[in-house]
C-alpha cells in the first residue's frame, strides 16, 4: 500500500483506503460504477510519475500498470490499438519487431501510454509531429456510470478533447488507437555545445525552421549546455559531425534511466519537476526570468537539470482543453527539474516558491504548464491558463458522466 501513498514527486503522502485492479476486483465498468455510486474518491495510477499528488487519493486507487499487455494492429495505415496500462517501452519494442515505431516518444519509456496521453506527451519527435496526443486516432473512455464511449475527433468529440491532456478528469482511458511510422534502424545525430541558457534559447527558432531535423532536445545537466539533433533520411544536408546512432530512442531511454535511477528508486528526496510550454516571445521572457533565478538559492542547490523541446503540431490540430498546447505554429517546452532532501523542509518550500514564480511568469507570457508537474495552481491561475468556459465545461461534463469524485486532484488539489 505504501507504493500507492505517494508519487514520483514524493512531497505529498495520501494513503488510499484500497487499491483495485481490473480482473482481480471486477471489470473496469463495475469498478468505476461502484466507486461513483458510493461517492468515493477515485484515481488511476499507471507508473506513478506525477509530481504533485495528481494520482493520489484517500479513496480508491485503480492500478492500471500492465506488464505483458498485448497491442494489435487495426484498420489501415498501420494503426495500433493498445491498452492504456502498457508502457511505451513495451509498445515500442513490439512495434520495432514489426518494422514500425511511435512518431513521438518520451525520453524515459517506463511510462504508461494512458498516463502520458492523460497529460499530453512530448518527445524528440515533437519537432515534426507534435504531441503524443496528436497521434491518437481514437480512445475508449469509461465514465463513472460504467458506460463505455468510443471517442475521436468526429465521435464523442467533446469527451475526446477533454480526456486527452485532461489529467483523468473526463474518465478512464481504457484503450487508444495510435498512428505509427516506419522504423529507422539508425539515424544521424549531432551534438551542439552552447555557452549558456541565452545561447541555447537563441538556437531554438533556427532548429525549428530546419526541414531536415527529425528529432530535437536541449539539455543543461549542471555540467554543460547542449542540443542534440537527429536528422531525417531525406535531409538535404546533414552536418559533417553527425554520426549514425542505431536504436536511438532505446539508447536515450537507457541513458535517462541510468541518470534517474537514484530518484526513481529512493525515497529520500522530493522531486519538484515542472514543464512549461511557450511561444517564441514567451520563451524569451520566461528564459530571462529563469536565468536570474538560477543564480540564486534555492536553485543553485536544488536544480538538477533543464530540458528543452521544440513542438510543431500537425495542421488542423485539435484544441485540447487542458493539454499544454498554444495557438502558435511552433511552441517550445522548458522542463525545470529540481530535487531536495525531504528532510530539508526549507529547501523544499523555497523551491516550491520559485516554481510558483515560474508558473506566474508562464501565465503572464501566454504559456501553459504540463499538468503532471509540481504546480501550485489557484482558481485565478486556472482561469488564466484555460479560460472560464473550459473550466465550466469540464465540471458540467463530470456531473453528466458521474465523475465528480474521479481524479479530483488533476490540478494538484484545487478544483475550479
Predicted feature descriptions by range:
Residues 259-262, 272, 356, 361-416:
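Activity-critical C-terminal alpha-helical subdomain
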Residues 214-220, 271, 299-320, 368-375:
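A short glycine-rich, hydrophobically flanked beta-strand micro-motif that places a catalytic Asp/Glu
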Residues 10-106, 120-125:
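Glycine-rich N-terminal segment of FAD-binding domains in flavoprotein oxidoreductases
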Residues 228-233, 264, 313-328, 379-391:
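Short glycine/threonine-rich loop-to-helix capping motif typified by GTGT followed
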Residues 84, 283-284, 340-353, 359-363, ...:
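Extended C-terminal subregions enriched in glycine
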Amino acid at each position: 500500500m505504501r507504493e500507492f501513498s505517494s508519487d514520483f514527486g514524493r512531497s505529498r503522502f495520501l494513503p488510499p483506503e484500497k487499491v483495485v485492479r481490473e480482473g482481480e476486483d471486477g471489470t473496469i465498468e463495475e469498478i468505476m460504477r461502484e466507486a461513483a455510486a458510493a461517492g468515493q474518491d477515485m484515481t488511476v495510477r499507471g507508473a506513478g510519475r506525477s509530481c504533485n499528488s495528481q494520482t493520489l487519493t484517500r479513496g480508491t486507487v485503480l492500478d492500471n500498470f500492465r506488464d505483458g499487455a498485448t497491442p494489435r494492429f487495426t484498420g489501415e495505415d498501420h494503426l495500433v490499438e493498445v491498452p492504456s496500462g502498457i508502457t511505451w517501452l513495451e509498445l515500442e519494442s513490439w512495434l520495432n519487431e514489426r518494422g514500425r515505431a511511435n512518431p513521438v516518444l518520451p525520453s524515459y519509456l517506463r511510462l504508461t501510454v494512458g498516463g502520458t496521453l492523460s497529460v499530453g506527451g512530448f518527445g524528440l519527435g515533437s519537432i515534426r509531429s507534435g504531441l503524443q496526443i496528436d497521434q491518437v486516432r481514437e480512445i475508449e473512455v469509461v465514465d463513472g456510470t460504467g458506460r463505455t464511449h468510443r471517442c475521436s475527433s468526429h465521435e464523442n468529440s467533446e469527451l475526446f478533447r477533454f480526456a486527452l491532456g485532461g489529467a483523468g478528469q473526463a474518465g478512464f482511458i481504457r484503450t487508444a488507437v495510435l498512428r505509427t511510422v516506419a522504423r529507422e534502424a539508425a539515424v544521424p545525430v549531432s551534438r551542439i555545445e552552447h555557452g549558456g541558457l541565452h545561447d541555447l534559447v537563441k538556437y531554438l527558432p533556427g532548429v525549428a525552421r530546419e526541414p531536415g531535423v527529425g528529432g530535437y532536445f536541449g539539455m543543461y545537466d549542471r555540467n554543460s549546455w547542449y542540443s542534440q539533433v537527429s536528422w531525417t533520411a531525406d535531409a538535404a544536408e546533414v552536418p559533417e559531425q553527425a554520426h549514425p546512432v542505431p536504436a536511438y530512442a532505446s539508447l536515450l531511454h537507457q541513458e535517462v534511466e541510468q541518470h534517474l535511477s537514484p530518484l526513481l528508486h529512493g525515497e529520500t528526496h522530493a522531486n519538484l519537476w515542472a514543464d512549461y510550454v511557450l511561444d517564441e516571445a514567451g520563451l524569451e521572457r520566461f528564459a530571462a526570468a529563469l536565468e536570474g533565478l538560477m543564480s540564486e538559492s534555492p536553485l543553485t542547490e536544488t536544480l538538477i537539470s533543464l530540458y528543452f523541446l521544440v513542438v510543431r503540431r500537425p495542421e488542423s490540430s485539435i484544441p485540447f482543453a487542458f493539454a499544454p498546447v498554444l495557438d502558435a505554429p511552433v511552441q517550445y517546452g522548458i522542463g525545470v527539474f529540481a530535487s531536495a532532501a525531504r528532510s530539508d523542509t526549507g529547501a523544499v518550500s523555497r523551491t516550491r516558491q520559485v516554481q510558483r514564480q515560474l508558473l506566474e511568469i508562464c501565465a503572464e507570457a501566454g504559456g501553459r504548464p504540463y499538468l503532471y508537474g509540481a504546480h501550485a495552481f489557484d482558481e485565478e491561475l486556472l482561469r488564466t491558463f484555460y479560460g472560464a468556459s473550459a473550466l465550466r465545461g469540464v465540471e458540467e461534463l463530470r456531473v453528466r458522466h458521474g465523475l465528480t469524485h474521479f481524479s479530483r486532484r488533476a490540478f494538484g488539489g484545487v478544483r475550479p
